[in-house]
From Swiss-Prot:
Membrane topology note: Multi-pass membrane protein
GO BP term, pick one: photosynthetic electron transport chain
Highest classification ranks of the organism: Bacteria, Bacillati, Cyanobacteriota, Cyanophyceae, Synechococcales
Entry GO terms, CC: photosystem I; photosystem II; plasma membrane-derived thylakoid membrane
Protein name listed in UniProt: Divinyl chlorophyll a/b light-harvesting protein PcbD
Chief location bin: membrane
Listed GO MF terms: chlorophyll binding
Assembly and binders: The antenna complex consists of divinyl chlorophylls (a and b) and divinyl chlorophyll a/b binding proteins and binds more divinyl chlorophyll b than does the antenna complex from high-light-adapted Prochlorococcus.
Cell compartment(s), UniProt: Cellular thylakoid membrane
Superkingdom of the source species: Bacteria
Record family assignment: Belongs to the PsbB/PsbC family. IsiA/Pcb subfamily.
């Protein structure tokens, strides 16, 4: 993390990232523990929503964000094709069990295992040490992340092809084969918000699966080849030396998640193919006052949650504002990674009483 030239810098308790910055074992512990928290939140919230679900009120008018996501991918339907929540409790309980497994793994890595995996006796584990200004180390780790995301995309494509997902045009679950038309995928970069074909949606995920797995394999191979053996010349400032750091990687992560949240907000607000009206409520209307926001357009006199708003309105607005603040975090950490010292700003403001001004005519 940025020290502004002070090698003995100390951090307050609130600067949690500083605890794991140069301790790869503890870094893994925080990741695994965070995964456990996400699983616990997903499982617990799903059970909470299921216990309060009222079949006489549209799902989108209730507190049903997790149920809506499950319904969209074809989970919770009986043999007659009606959504009854069958199997949902099982999925929620599995998430709760997994949260304990992940929590235990986080504790093991945080308390029992080595602080740094490079000290581990396991040869493969040593490869995941943290060297923030080493492009080989960072690209090797990036490659594994890309492969995991690619596998997740492939699983989703196969789930839609074999099990089927909910098609709002039919009002039923159907099997969806992906459309791997590359010209369509290219054009959908610009009009994806209006996409109305599940085949195109799955085609995009299939393409992402291929691109991410291929890219991940490339990065792993590239990371396993020392920089000096790649015939790329010296690892210089021009090529990123001394810019690649823990703070820089954090800023890029915040930029990615912030951008995805904002894109999801615009998509959720208006698209009824990926976010079916039956599960999320009616499409929203875009407004702008001090900042952008979206409002409901349907009759919500029967709404039971979100202060009288639909699940779509809650999901959209929360995603947008979380994305906005994630991007502010990106700018903050990116500037710090570039060497900008925010302390100079506060020092300048605090010294304004002693400042002298000269006006030249």
């Amino acid at each position: 993390m940025q020290t502004y030239g002070n090698p003995e810098v100390t951090y307050g308790w609130w600067a949690g990232n500083s605890v794991v910055t140069n301790r790869s074992g503890r870094f893994i512990a925080s990741h695994v523990g965070h995964t456990g928290l996400i699983c616990f939140a997903a499982g617990g919230s799903t059970l909470w929503e299921l216990a309060r679900y009222n079949p006489e009120i549209p799902m989108g008018h209730q507190s049903s964000l997790f149920l809506a996501h499950l319904a969209s991918i074809g989970i919770g339907f009986d043999e007659a094709g009606a959504w009854t929540g069958v199997g949902v409790a099982t999925i929620a309980i599995v998430h709760l069990i997994l949260s304990m497994v992940y929590g235990g793994g986080g504790l093991l890595h945080g308390i029992l295992f080595d602080e740094n995996v490079e000290d581990s006796e396991v040869l493969q584990a040593k490869k995941f040490k943290l060297e923030w200004n080493n492009p080989d180390n960072q690209t090797f780790i990036l490659g594994h992340h890309l492969i995991f995301m690619g596998v997740a995309c492939a699983w989703f494509v196969e789930w839609a092809r074999i099990h089927g997902i909910y098609d709002p045009a039919l009002g039923a679950i159907r099997q969806v084969n992906y459309n791997l038309d590359l010209s369509m995928i290219w054009q959908r970069q610009f009009d994806f918000i209006t996409i109305d074909s599940l085949e195109d949606v799955m085609g995009g995920h299939a393409f992402l699966a291929f691109a991410e797995i291929t890219g991940g394999a490339f990065h792993i191979v590239a990371g396993s080849t020392p920089w000096e053996d790649k015939k790329l010349g010296e690892w210089s400032k021009f090529k990123g030396s001394e810019l690649l750091s823990a703070e820089a990687v954090l800023s890029w992560s915040l930029a990615g998640i912030g951008w995805m949240a904002i894109v999801a907000a615009f998509w959720c607000a208006s698209n009824t193919t990926v976010y079916p009206e039956a599960w999320y409520g009616e499409p929203l209307q875009f407004k702008f006052a001090i900042s952008p926001y979206w409002v409901d357009t349907g009759d919500l006199s029967d709404a039971t949650a979100f202060w009288g708003h639909s699940a779509r309105a809650a999901l959209t607005n929360v995603h947008y504002y979380l994305g906005f603040f994630f991007l502010q975090g990106h700018f903050w950490h990116a500037l710090r990674a570039l060497g900008f010292n925010f302390k100079n700003v506060t020092a300048s403001i605090g010294n304004e009483q002693k400042a002298t001004f000269t006006i030249k005519s």
